[in-house]
C-alpha cells in the first residue's frame, strides 16, 4: 500500500467516486476507506435524499452517519422532487466546503444519471409545470404510442432514445417543448450547465463478473429488508398527504412494487418477486452504463475482500497524485 498524502489530493482538487450496481458493496468500501482517510461522503443516490425511506433504500445507519459525515441524505420529503441539475449545484457547494475542511469528498452511489450530470453537465431547462405534465400524462395513459408519435414530430432525436413505455422521460421531453417551443435536444445542445469541471473525479467501479452472485445478493438483501420492516415503513410513507404513484420517491425500486401491493394489484409473493426482478434489472442498467465509462479503476466485489479493495483504492489515489 502506497503512502497517501491527502493534502496533495485536495491541492489537485481530486474527488473520489465509488460507483457500482445496487448490492455491490459501495457503502462497505466507503466506510472502510474512512479508517484510512479523512473523508466526507456525498450520496449519489436519488432515493437516499428522502426522509423516512430508510430500510427500502439501504440507507446508511445513524451510527454510520455519525461516524463519517454524510451529505444529500434525508434532505427532502417523499412528496418533493429533486433533479440532476439540483444535484450538480449541491455537489459544487459541498465539494468546496469539504476541501476547505481539509477532507476528501467521496461521491458514492449508483444513480448513474447523477454521475453523468457531474461529468457531462446538464442543460438549463425550465422547472416542471404540473398542469402541463398532468395533461400529457393523462394522454400517455390513454395511448402511449400516440404521445410518442407526438414527440417524434417535434423532437425526432429525443423520440429515438426515449421509449414509449418510459413515461417520465417522454412526458418531460414534451413538457419542455410545450413550455419553450424548442425541442429538448436543441436546448441540451445550446446551453450546458457546467458539471464538476473545476474538480477531478478519480473513479472506482465495483463490477462483479459473476452476475449470478450479484442476483443472489440482491435477493438476500431484499428479504433482509422485509425482515427489518420494509412493508411497515412503506405503508407509513404512503400515508403522507400529497403522495401519488407518479412521484420520483414512489417510482424507486421496491417502493413502486409495495405501492401496487397495498393497492391490491399484487399479492405478497408477486410483490416480492417483482421487487427482486426490478432490482436486478436496475443492476443490469447500472453495469451497462459503467462498462461505457473510461478512466476508472474496476474492482470485482466478489473476487476480493474489502481490505484488498481499500488497498487498491489507496494505491490508485496515490498514483494519481504522483502522475498529476
Swiss-Prot record:
Signal sequence extent: none
* Entries under Gene3D superfamilies matching the protein: 1.10.20.140, P-loop containing nucleotide triphosphate hydrolases (3.40.50.300)
Q: Which reaction does it catalyse?
A: adenosine(37) in tRNA + dimethylallyl diphosphate = N(6)-dimethylallyladenosine(37) in tRNA + diphosphate
Q: Does the keyword tRNA processing apply?
A: yes
Q: Which GO terms describe its biological process?
A: tRNA modification
The record's annotation in Pfam families points to: IPPT
Instruction: Provide the residue span(s) of the region labelled Interaction with substrate tRNA.
Output: 45-48, 168-172, 284-291
Keyword DNA damage recorded: no
Q: Which cofactor does it need?
A: Mg(2+)
Give binding positions for substrate: 22-27
* Alphabetical keyword list: ATP-binding, Magnesium, Nucleotide-binding, Transferase, tRNA processing
Q: Where does ATP bind?
A: 20-27
The coiled-coil regions, if any, are: none
Judged by the first EC level, this protein's enzyme class is transferase
Q: Where is this site: Interaction with substrate tRNA?
A: 111, 133
Q: Which domain of life is it from?
A: Bacteria
According to its UniProt record, the EC number is: 2.5.1.75
Q: Which GO terms describe its molecular function?
A: ATP binding; tRNA dimethylallyltransferase activity
Task of the protein: Catalyzes the transfer of a dimethylallyl group onto the adenine at position 37 in tRNAs that read codons beginning with uridine, leading to the formation of N6-(dimethylallyl)adenosine (i(6)A).
Assembly and interaction partners: Monomer.
Task: Identify the HAMAP family for this entry.
Answer: IPP_trans (MF_00185)
Q: Which family does it belong to?
A: Belongs to the IPP transferase family.
Under PANTHER family, the record lists: TRNA DIMETHYLALLYLTRANSFERASE (PTHR11088:SF60)
Query: What is the name listed in the Swiss-Prot or TrEMBL entry for this protein?
Result: tRNA dimethylallyltransferase
Native organism:
Hydrogenovibrio crunogenus (strain DSM 25203 / XCL-2) (Thiomicrospira crunogena)
- Supply the gene name: miaA
Amino acid at each position: 500500500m502506497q503512502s497517501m498524502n491527502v493534502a496533495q489530493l485536495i491541492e489537485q482538487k481530486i474527488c473520489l467516486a465509488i460507483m457500482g450496481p445496487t448490492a455491490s458493496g459501495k457503502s462497505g468500501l466507503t466506510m472502510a476507506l474512512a479508517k484510512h482517510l479523512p473523508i466526507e461522503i456525498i450520496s449519489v443516490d436519488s432515493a437516499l435524499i428522502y426522509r423516512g425511506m430508510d430500510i427500502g433504500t439501504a440507507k446508511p445507519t445513524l451510527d454510520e452517519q455519525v461516524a463519517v459525515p454524510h451529505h444529500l441524505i434525508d434532505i427532502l420529503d417523499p412528496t418533493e422532487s429533486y433533479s440532476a441539475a439540483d444535484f450538480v449545484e449541491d455537489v459544487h457547494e459541498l465539494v468546496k466546503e469539504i476541501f476547505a475542511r481539509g477532507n476528501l469528498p467521496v461521491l458514492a452511489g449508483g444513480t448513474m444519471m447523477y454521475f453523468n450530470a457531474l461529468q457531462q453537465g446538464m442543460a438549463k431547462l425550465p422547472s416542471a409545470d404540473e398542469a402541463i405534465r398532468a395533461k400529457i400524462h393523462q394522454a400517455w395513459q390513454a395511448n402511449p404510442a400516440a404521445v410518442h408519435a407526438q414527440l417524434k414530430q417535434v423532437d425526432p432525436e429525443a423520440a429515438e432514445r426515449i421509449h414509449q413505455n418510459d413515461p417520465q422521460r417522454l412526458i418531460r421531453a414534451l413538457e419542455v417543448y410545450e413550455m419553450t417551443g424548442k425541442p429538448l435536444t436543441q436546448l441540451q445542445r445550446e446551453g450546458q450547465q457546467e458539471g464538476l469541471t473545476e474538480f477531478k473525479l478519480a473513479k472506482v467501479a465495483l463490477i462483479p463478473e459473476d452476475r449470478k452472485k450479484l442476483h443472489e445478493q440482491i435477493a438476500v438483501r431484499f428479504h433482509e429488508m422485509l425482515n427489518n420492516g420494509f412493508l411497515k415503513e412503506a405503508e407509513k410513507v404512503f400515508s403522507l398527504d400529497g403522495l401519488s404513484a407518479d412521484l420520483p420517491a414512489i417510482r424507486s425500486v421496491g417502493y413502486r412494487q409495495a405501492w401496487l401491493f397495498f393497492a391490491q394489484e399484487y399479492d405478497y409473493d408477486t410483490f416480492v418477486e417483482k421487487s427482486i426482478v426490478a432490482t436486478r434489472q436496475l443492476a443490469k442498467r447500472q453495469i451497462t452504463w459503467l462498462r461505457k465509462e473510461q478512466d476508472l479503476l474496476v474492482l470485482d466485489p466478489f473476487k476480493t475482500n474489502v481490505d484488498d479493495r481499500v488497498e487498491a483504492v489507496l494505491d490508485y489515489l496515490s498514483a494519481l497524485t504522483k502522475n498529476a
